[in-house]
Amino acid sequence: MDDKSMARGRKAFVTGFPIRHSRSPLIHGFWLKELGIDGSYEAVEVKPEDFSSFAASLAANGFAGGNVTIPHKEAAYAAAESLDEAARAIGAVNTLWLENGRLCGGNTDAYGFAANLDASAPGWDKADRALVLGAGGASRAVVHALLSRGVCHVSVVNRTLSRAEELAAHFGARVYAHSWDEAQALVSNAGLIVNTTALGMSGHGEGQDFPIDLTCAPKEAVATDIVYVPLRTAFLNKAEKAGLKTVDGLGMLLHQAVPGFERWFGQRPQVTQALREHILADMAKAGAL
């Protein structure tokens, strides 16, 4: 029996609350059509108080698995009977699947972050030092990716220093916490600068100047933002003006979807320019570029 036959009729989902904004159905729908797989992927809105019962009834509802987004990533971590290494390190689950009747959880955000940089800025992981702006939930996946790829020194800056200290304590050696006031001084020796804050994203002062001068960064430094709405954030615009190589956040969204699709439907999809243009067209239609 070939992979397409095995995947026939399989169902997967993305769940969050709210979920109407998700572009995951567009991504997976594109791959299902491209690969000729008779499966489905749907958005399912689940309230926080209903998540545990939803997770427990995946098999009964005919799902092979699915993606989990805000605010359910920690609840999915708690619900999973088995966790992959990335999920354990990050403390959150964004991908669920059933294996021999057991609910398994993984986290593909770190994979997606690194794969996006591999595709758009190959050699990025030669940087000895990285600067991560922000210490929210998303920054954990970024830090895990950096450590996994051998970055020697990761500086995390945050307006609330205790959040950065908590993150540094979680990951241990090679991760250092700093206050936001120290960010400017840290730019000068950072080979990779990652923005994980909401500064510059839609609804968070996207028209304003990013509050850090990037002109003193090493000329070979790479700057990337995990935000993809808008595609060109205030941070990326400033990095570009400073002459840095920039990588937008859309690729992270696309690449993080790959492992889950392969688990549910049995074929590994490719992140192509055609897929990117498909999502960009939807973003343009929604006025989200």
Swiss-Prot record:
Keywords, ordered alphabetically: Amino-acid biosynthesis, Aromatic amino acid biosynthesis, NADP, Oxidoreductase
Superkingdom: Bacteria
The UniProt record lists the keyword Amino-acid biosynthesis: yes
EC number from the UniProt entry: 1.1.1.25
Listed SUPFAM superfamilies: Aminoacid dehydrogenase-like, N-terminal domain (SSF53223), NAD(P)-binding Rossmann-fold domains (SSF51735)
EC class (word): oxidoreductase
InterPro entries (alphabetical): Aminoacid_DH-like_N_sf, NAD(P)-bd_dom_sf, SDH_C, Shikimate_DH, Shikimate_DH-bd_N, Shikimate_DH_fam, Shikm_DH/Glu-tRNA_Rdtase
One Pfam entry name: Shikimate_DH
Residues that coordinate or bind shikimate: S22, R23, S24, T69, N94, D109, Y228
GO molecular function terms noted in the UniProt entry: NADP binding; shikimate 3-dehydrogenase (NADP+) activity
A Gene Ontology BP annotation from the UniProt entry: aromatic amino acid family biosynthetic process
Substrates-to-products reaction catalysed: shikimate + NADP(+) = 3-dehydroshikimate + NADPH + H(+)
Gene Ontology terms: cellular component: cytosol
Sequence positions that bind NADP(+): E85, G134, A135, G136, G137, A138, N158, R159, T160, L161, S162, R163, I226, G249
Family classification: Belongs to the shikimate dehydrogenase family.
PANTHER family the UniProt entry points to: BIFUNCTIONAL 3-DEHYDROQUINATE DEHYDRATASE_SHIKIMATE DEHYDROGENASE, CHLOROPLASTIC, SHIKIMATE DEHYDROGENASE
Cited function: Involved in the biosynthesis of the chorismate, which leads to the biosynthesis of aromatic amino acids. Catalyzes the reversible NADPH linked reduction of 3-dehydroshikimate (DHSA) to yield shikimate (SA).
Self-association state and partner proteins as the record states: Homodimer.
Name the record gives this protein: Shikimate dehydrogenase (NADP(+))
The organism's taxonomic lineage, starting at the top: Bacteria, Pseudomonadati, Pseudomonadota, Alphaproteobacteria, Hyphomicrobiales
Gene, per the UniProt record: aroE
